[in-house]
Amino acid sequence: MQQLTEIVEQALVIIDQASDLKALDDIRVDYLGKKGKITDMMKMMGSLSPEEKPAFGQAVNDAKQAIQQKLTERIDGLKSSELEAKLIAEKIDVTLPGRTQEIGGLHPVTRTIERIETFFGELGFSVKQGPEIEDDFHNFDALNISEHHPARADHDTFYFNPKLMLRTQTSGVQIRTMETEKPPLRIISPGRVYRNDYDQTHTPMFHQVEGLLVDEHVNFAELKGILHDFLRNFFEEDLQVRFRPSYFPFTEPSAEVDVMGKNGKWLEVLGCGMVHPNVLRSVGIDPEKYSGFAFGMGVERLTMLRYGVNDLRSFFENDLRFLKQFK
């Protein structure tokens, strides 16, 4: 019995000194395992008399329970300490700002369209929309584009049939507006247009903004002043701007507008001119009473110049590495 008492006392001391769960498991095996010290004590019962066996068996069983209880308490204590230490290590400072969710940004082409709409909106221009599938009257005939003009060729225009096509410019919106509204008119018509072309500076689909002003006594000086102010506002620079004589079937006189680039070279940015009298007649407006001017610009080209993008196709490839630069 004395030996059993010493084994229990020794086990309890060692259990208290154990610093981790592995050490406790080693103690369990050393005392309660198949070859453990308590198990060895049970083997001594074979040498005892029948009278001694019950008391000895009870003592061994009590010793085993005492050690097991101590092990359980110590295991629970170590697990609690480990959990507390882990919680302290993972403590969250609730006063810190939370993780913000990444949000999307406007596409650079959309930014440009909104910038254009804002500028002309402040000048009293309203935004008009029209169909992207257009008929030949609104896309060509009403714009004074002759039947044999190169723009009507199959290699330039996407035709559904001889009378229906994907619009090649948003000028059709101007025609539709003049058909349904009377002067004075101030409108811009942003939207997608389609031409059969694809390279570094052209895509089959691109965006265009065209503008129209029709009223009495409208002159080219007004057109120059508005476009000059627009370009300086858009590029946020005191740009050098020039107007070059050009030709468009729907305007007379016509001009192309250039700005001086940072490399010292002129860069074409838009076309413009006074609305051709034939265009006004085609929609029932008297050219003897009213005059007007029109202008058109490629949105992607303006965006490329504003942000220094070299390849127009980058706007349509949906590469987040590219698009995130404009957030």
Curated annotation (Swiss-Prot):
Enzyme nomenclature, EC number: 6.1.1.20
Any one Gene Ontology BP term: phenylalanyl-tRNA aminoacylation
Catalytic activity: tRNA(Phe) + L-phenylalanine + ATP = L-phenylalanyl-tRNA(Phe) + AMP + diphosphate + H(+)
Cofactor(s), names only, from the UniProt record: Mg(2+)
Listed GO CC annotations: cytoplasm
InterPro entries: aa-tRNA-synth_II, aa-tRNA-synth_II/BPL/LPL, Phe-tRNA-synth_IIc_asu, Phe-tRNA_ligase_II_N, Phe_tRNA_ligase_alpha1_bac, Phenylalanyl-tRNA_Synthase, tRNA-bd_arm
An example Gene Ontology molecular-function term: magnesium ion binding
Entry keyword Lyase: no
Cofactor note: Binds 2 magnesium ions per tetramer.
Family per similarity comment: Belongs to the class-II aminoacyl-tRNA synthetase family. Phe-tRNA synthetase alpha subunit type 1 subfamily.
Subunit (UniProt): Tetramer of two alpha and two beta subunits.
Protein name (database record): Phenylalanine--tRNA ligase alpha subunit
Organism: Shewanella baltica (strain OS223)
Gene: pheS
